[in-house]
Amino acid sequence: MADIKNYTLNFGPQHPAAHGVLRLVLELDGEVIQRADPHIGLLHRATEKLAEQKTWIQSVPYMDRLDYVSMMVNEHAYVMAIERLLGLEVPLRAQYIRVMFDEITRIMNHLMWIGSHALDVGAMAVFLYAFREREDLFDMYEAVSGARMHAAYYRPGGVYRDLPDTMPQYKASKVRNEKALAALNQTRSGSLLDFIEDFTNRFPKYVDEYETLLTDNRIWKQRLVGIGVVSPERALNKGFSGAMLRGSGIEWDVRKKQPYEVYDRIDFDIPVGVNGDCYDRYLVRVEEMRQSNRIIRQCIEWLRKNPGPVITDNHKVAPPSRVDMKTNMEELIHHFKLFTEGMHVPEGEAYAAVEHPKGEFGIYAISDGANKPYRLKIRAPGFVHLAALDEMAKGHMIADAVTIIGTQDIVFGEIDR
């Protein structure tokens, strides 16, 4: 009788658990994975090359579209790289607003992760709960920028505008009765800070709900404990960062170890795993949501007490106010030059890294003194994590590959760029 050889299976790119456009070529022995070969590039949009044809400020919206679940954090790394090249001082209020929205974005990302990860494993309820909370976070984005996803809110030298004093209200429609409308607008009667504070009061209870459903759930633990184990040494050698590295027991967080903006003024803890498996990475991310909530509350407290400018007054970098522009010819010229020719960034190179929800997201920008980047290199954390999929999945069942992809928190916008 002929020997039964390993067979090859295509997983994705149109698989519901492939997190976008991942194509995995799996070499199987029965149902056991011998080799996993990720094929990338199906969402490649040449972002790095496009940035070379655009002025420095025109590339901000492209950053939103890299990891399209963590929009503002991508922008943050990019504007920080420009600020380092310019040697620009950012107003303190703008720094606090950035930190607050970074953490709002982190919660937004982790809600998407916990919902889709649980859905992949077979728990549908968490996905629906997570999207209930994300709706409030999208409303926060919409209040400051007018856009629910691709905000383009951060600017070199600060942020686009200050936090609004009123929240947008839901309007009556054919699909909403008076009772539903009143419930939706109940928390929207005050300012944006009031709305965010109300959310931070409610959010810990929501995280408790997710933990009640998952943390001690027998099926959840059977599917995650001991799956995709990565030792601290291998995690470092593979270039892991973020929750993937902390889940393996290494206490590394860019916000603590290389503080940027005002993270050195804020009190928070770094959750760290022990076993380096999918379950530990789950626990780390859940605790990260609680810590982000804590950071947001500290930012709200500071922002309430300290009004001030939210963008630099250097009009070669940031536009003048509309009032000044309409009354002063010089300001009008600044505005015209900035949005036609763009700003000229001094010759040099800079690397800016932020603690992205998925790991260390870095922008390496090289300027030749022109109004466009000479070269822009994007360091995507998910790219490194996906490269380790073969090692993490070897010897596991095919169903465990879904769990491992979920625990890596893969989004292809940043991997394919």
UniProtKB/Swiss-Prot annotation:
KW Membrane (keyword) present: yes
Q: Which GO terms describe its molecular function?
A: NAD binding; NADH:ubiquinone reductase (non-electrogenic) activity; quinone binding
Q: Where in the cell is it found?
A: Cell inner membrane
Reactions it catalyzes: a quinone + NADH + 5 H(+)(in) = a quinol + NAD(+) + 4 H(+)(out)
Q: Which UniProt keywords apply?
A: Cell inner membrane, Cell membrane, Membrane, NAD, Quinone, Translocase, Transport, Ubiquinone
Q: Which domain of life is it from?
A: Bacteria
Give the matching InterPro entries.
Answer: NADH_Q_OxRdtase_suD, NADH_UbQ_OxRdtase_49kDa_CS, NDH1_su_D/H, NiFe-Hase_large
Q: What class of enzyme is it?
A: translocase
- In the UniProt record, which is one GO cellular component term? plasma membrane
Q: Which Gene3D superfamilies does this UniProt record tie to the protein?
A: Cytochrome-c3 Hydrogenase, chain B
What membrane topology was assigned to this protein in its record?
Peripheral membrane protein
**Keyword Membrane in record:** yes
List its EC numbers: 7.1.1.-
UniProt family annotation? Belongs to the complex I 49 kDa subunit family.
* NCBIfam families assigned: NuoD, PRK06075.1
The entry describes its oligomerization and partners as: NDH-1 is composed of 14 different subunits. Subunits NuoB, C, D, E, F, and G constitute the peripheral sector of the complex.
What is the recorded function of this protein according to its Swiss-Prot or TrEMBL entry?
NDH-1 shuttles electrons from NADH, via FMN and iron-sulfur (Fe-S) centers, to quinones in the respiratory chain. The immediate electron acceptor for the enzyme in this species is believed to be ubiquinone. Couples the redox reaction to proton translocation (for every two electrons transferred, four hydrogen ions are translocated across the cytoplasmic membrane), and thus conserves the redox energy in a proton gradient.
The protein here is known as NADH-quinone oxidoreductase subunit D
* Highest classification ranks of the organism: Bacteria, Pseudomonadati, Pseudomonadota, Betaproteobacteria, Burkholderiales
